[in-house]
Amino acid sequence: MQGMASVVSCEPWALLGRGALCTKARPGGGPAAGTVVAPGSPDRGRPRSRNSLASQDQQGAVTSGTAHKALFSRDTNFLQEINRKQEAAPTGTRHKAKSQGLVTFGDVAVVFSQEEWEWLNSEQRSLYWKVMLDNYRNLASLGLCASQPDMITSLEQGRDPWMMKRKMRKGQHLDLKAMQETKEFPPKDLSEETLFLAVLRKQLLPHRPKCSMVRAAWEGGAVFTTHRGLKTNSGLARDSPAQLVSAQRSFCKSVTWENCGDRGSVGQQSVQEAQDLLPRQDSHAERVTGRTWSTKLECSTFRDQDSECTFERNEQETVTPNRAFSEGRDGMCIESGRWFHLNSSDERSHNCDSGKSFSSNPVVVKETGICSGKKLFQCNECKKTFTQSSSLTVHQRIHTGEKPYKCNQCGKAFSDGSSFARHQRCHTGKKPYECPECGKAFIQNTSLVRHWRYYHTGEKPFDCIDCGKAFSDHIGLNQHRRIHTGEKPYTCEVCHKSFRYGSSLTVHQRIHTGEKPYECEICRKAFSHHASLTQHQRVHSGEKPFKCKECGKAFRQNIHLASHWRIHTGEKPFECGECGKSFSISSQLATHQRIHTGEKPYECKVCRKAFTQKAHLAQHQKTHTGEKPYECKECGKAFSQTTHLIQHQRVHTGEKPYKCLECGKAFGDNSSCTQHRRLHTGQRPYECVECGKTFKTKSSLICHRRCHTGEKPYECSACGKAFSHRQSLSVHQRIHSGKKPYECKECRKTFIQIGHLNQHKRVHTGERTYNYKKGRRAFRQTAHFAHHQQIHSGKSPAHHSLPSTSNPVDLFSKFVWNPSSLPSS
């Protein structure tokens, strides 16, 4: 038979120690033709296939480095003849022939680890490249390679072969037991970590796990720990330390894995790991240091099975003075259940379904904390824990007050970069997050999520454990929880008032500063709160987005809708602790409580008068400005308040909606009806603290108090005379104007006051209302009656001279008609 094509396979130590190559045994057994056998070792070469170690009966020959070119002679007729025989043979025979040695590139490919590759010198590496490329070309010329392997592509590109180690999971491994039997060992300077991993993989290879993901990582060198709480079986033969050479030291560690896809019986394997398979060389003590690095990841995929899967990656790292953790490591993302590769460099080599990217080993520990719920970083000040060190750093700025991120436009500072980035969108107007339902855009993604839940889905996944109230986001829940705890962590430095929310404090501080940063573009009115501006803009647009489902009434603000809804339900959740009175709106309760406390926080800057409500202050200020924006369309009369206009319009319409239940009398306004009812009840709730006199109305008490104080706030602009009552000023001004609005229907006589008209009417009717009991004399006016009583009491009348014309009331006593003064007939 002519010379056969020789395809070379080599063991790692063949290149390391002796510079020789071993050949693949031919199907017939014995050394291949045309090969040079090394003296003293006719059958000790133990080549391994990619899938399993070579059988004992396969023999190889070792050739010298100088004669390796003789191995590359080709004889295509030989292999083609074998192919024809196998195709013509029966099925059983064909399979047997295949098992006996039809060569593939996987059978002859040798993969070095990084540690092994580093021990090769430049000559050995060049020899390795040449042999592997020649082997591939030989097989390709025979048609035994359908496509170019990745390993050859890498070699042609000049990359080191150990980079392809994980892609070729079933690489060649050492058979330590076989080497012991043949008394043949690799050179002592071979990396002991390489030997250990080789033995470990060989021993556990028949017991690979069934789970595809777990098996893929296992074949790359990963080690798994069992699920806690699941049934396990143990049954793996253990390598005794006696099987190793005397110089070897060992330690034991349980290495287990399981079938993640099956809750049933879980196979558990245990092996003895050899830590120091070979004695260390002193010359290499500083260069090679074996270290074990573990990364534990908790698997949330199997929590519904009452179990916990942890992935532990034990790996021997070679650490040099200038290089550490150079080899990548495998891991699994717990959120996505996906395997990824870890590089020690800063580049991120994996993106999982949860949006996280992983780089170096410490980052994996950080991601482990997120997935498993563990919090690894604790603040020394408040003991709060975080899953990321960066979160702890940002949190610590709360205690230190540090705000390193400053806006160049407004000077506002922030403690974290994300808040600073969001703030800058306020200046740029950029709103990258748009609602797909209504098209509304937001600065923050969280704002879009809250909007989506609140307006479109109605989802409220966050429940309060105290009252059961649900919220669409955790921020709203946390703020609500402060109602139950009473916590008010935000305090104003000026007035020391505390608030539950930081936004409330910010708005409150504008009261002290007078800042109103939000301005309406239509009317230029400014507001201290953005929500107030939004509500105000609905006045111009007429928008009322909040609609009552019961009656269909629409409102500009959500809080107004909530208050209105309580009209239908009758709910009054806000109760006064002093008198027990309930209210449907919290602001009404706050206003009511000022009655008990006497607090009047709203003060007029002109007259220093204080009010309990801001609306009352606004109404009062119109008395100083003279502003009367509300005008009656019927008569043109103007009013300072809209309620006064409504009451006035009832004069034209004749509407009297308020009716007395006692006498049936109707009134145009509620206050008049309330005052009228006190005539029936005799109630006089307003008492003067000076003299004890009581009054039915509060306005009557206020006017009465001026008798004690002498206050006369109403002054005539024509003559300068002052009055204690506004009505007295109005009557007096008619003297200057000559206006007499009250006319007698009998004689057409006119009067300045309605009281004068009533007195005049008694002249026509002859009515005498006031009777004197002693003399049985009657009088039409109280003034006449009082003057007459002074005559009987012996007191001289107070005024004998003509009355002053300044008060027209005094003139009537001199001109009143008296029938007794007429001469008798």
Swiss-Prot record:
Expressed predominantly in ovary. GO terms for biological process: regulation of DNA-templated transcription. PANTHER family: ZINC FINGER PROTEIN (PTHR24376), ZINC FINGER PROTEIN 606 (PTHR24376:SF211). Residues 26-65 are annotated as: Disordered. InterPro entries: KRAB, KRAB_dom_sf, Znf_C2H2_sf, Znf_C2H2_type. Keywords: DNA-binding, Metal-binding, Nucleus, Repeat, Transcription, Transcription regulation, Zinc, Zinc-finger. Residues 51-65 have a biased composition (Polar residues). It comes from the Eukaryota. Residues 33-42 have a biased composition (Low complexity). Residues 103-174 form the KRAB domain. May be involved in transcriptional regulation. May have a role in embryonic development. Pfam families: KRAB, zf-C2H2, zf-C2H2_6. It is found in: Nucleus. Gene3D superfamilies: 6.10.140.140, Classic Zinc Finger. Its main location: nucleus. Coiled coil: none annotated. Belongs to the krueppel C2H2-type zinc-finger protein family. A zinc finger (C2H2-type) spans 377-399, 405-427, 433-456, 462-484, 490-512, 518-540, 546-568, 574-596, 602-624, 630-652, 658-680, 686-708, 714-736, 742-764, 770-792. It comes from Mus musculus. GO terms for cellular component: nucleus. SMART domains: KRAB, ZnF_C2H2. This is Zinc finger protein 28. Changing residue 658 to I: In strain: 129/Sv; requires 2 nucleotide substitutions. GO terms for molecular function: DNA binding; zinc ion binding.
